[in-house]
Amino acid sequence: MLGAGGVLYLTPMVFHQAHFSAGRVTEGLALAAVAGTLGRILCGVLLDRGLNCSVPVLMAALIAIAGDIRLIGTEAFGGYLQGQLLLGIAMGLYWPAIELAVPLSCAPVSSARAFALARSADALGIATGALGGALLAWRGLLRGVYVVDITCLLILLLVLLRRALPDPRPQDRLAHPSPLGQWLPALVPMLAITVLATAMPALMQSALPLDLVQGGLMRRALPESLGALTIGLQLGLLLLIQWPVGQALARRPVTTGLTLSLISFALGNLLLAASAFTTWGLPVLLLAQLPLALGEAAFLPTATEAVVELSPIEHQGLAMALLSQCFAISGFGAPLLAGRLLDAQGHAVGLWLLMALACLGGLLLVRDLAPRRTFG
């Protein structure tokens, strides 16, 4: 995730430098989100039929390298869309496989603790990548984030070619799966919560960088290097708190983590909106990064653990594909909405207030979930 950190969070700034409008930047991000839809479902179905998790991850790495190469050298909107299309397909193949690999690889550690550790590793990679991207932005080499990503992907290819991911699933369960109607309805509220909650990381990758460089109602616009550092601050906070938060929530029902996440996101959005109403908005904006990081730290391991609890082992590939598809739905819709609001209003106050209300409303869905583990 080190290379992905720079690509995910700093691509909007790369093409802001190329004089793309907010709408065009977010259209590319939305295309990337929707491009992996078929790949996700296909990946999930094949995983449930016994495909080793290593195969989709290897394919994703090769496609992502092609996408990075396309984005390095283009200044045209068409080239930008092509690069985002390739990255979207790669993410579609990657996420169901890598998420399923966590519970399959973690014995004798519980899957909840394993997801907390995996999310901590993700946070380390993304934060390091984004901070490295901020340094590249300061040096005027912002497109270097794609070179970093290619390097990391090549290392991933070498590691997986030397040692494949384990797959201890019982073949008799895979050969005789339970009907979808026995488990899918119970998963639906969790998927709806995921669409809502994952809109926040999508907006942190798309709308927040543009909000920072455009400025608020009274808040001054930030230079691109300082904007990248602000995003890096949130990712650094996420890195610091991901492991302790994930460990604490691993001992509690999934509803606890989801409630904490939605409340934290609502508070962070309110602070982001408030930062636009003063010339001294930067301290308020920086303060908002704390609840936003807490919300993400609480949600990411809890959501994947909830899916494991709510789905049988022979359908967990498809369940992880549906979970990652929720990321894609919010990744498609949230940037499009954000781009339209930013272009129409010239600021992001309405966007942040809308998201705060949506997160508070999402608490109603949490009540429909029930923990499936015993806690002591």
Language model features with spans:
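Helix-to-loop junctions at the C-terminal end of transmembrane segments
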Residues: 39-52, 240-254
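A late C-terminal transmembrane helix in Major Facilitator Superfamily
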Residues: 315-343
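Core transmembrane helices of Major Facilitator Superfamily
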Residues: 87-98, 291-303
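Symmetry-related core transmembrane helices of the 12-TM Major Facilitator Superfamily/SLC fold
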Residues: 145-161, 351-367
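Cytoplasmic helix-loop-helix junction between adjacent transmembrane helices
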Residues: 87-122
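Helix-loop boundary and gating motifs at the non-cytosolic
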Residues: 1-33, 189, 198-218
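Structural signature of the two symmetry-related core transmembrane helices
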Residues: 55-69, 256-271
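Interfacial helix-cap and linker-helix signal at transmembrane-aqueous boundaries
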Residues: 15-16, 46-47, 135-140, 248-249, ...
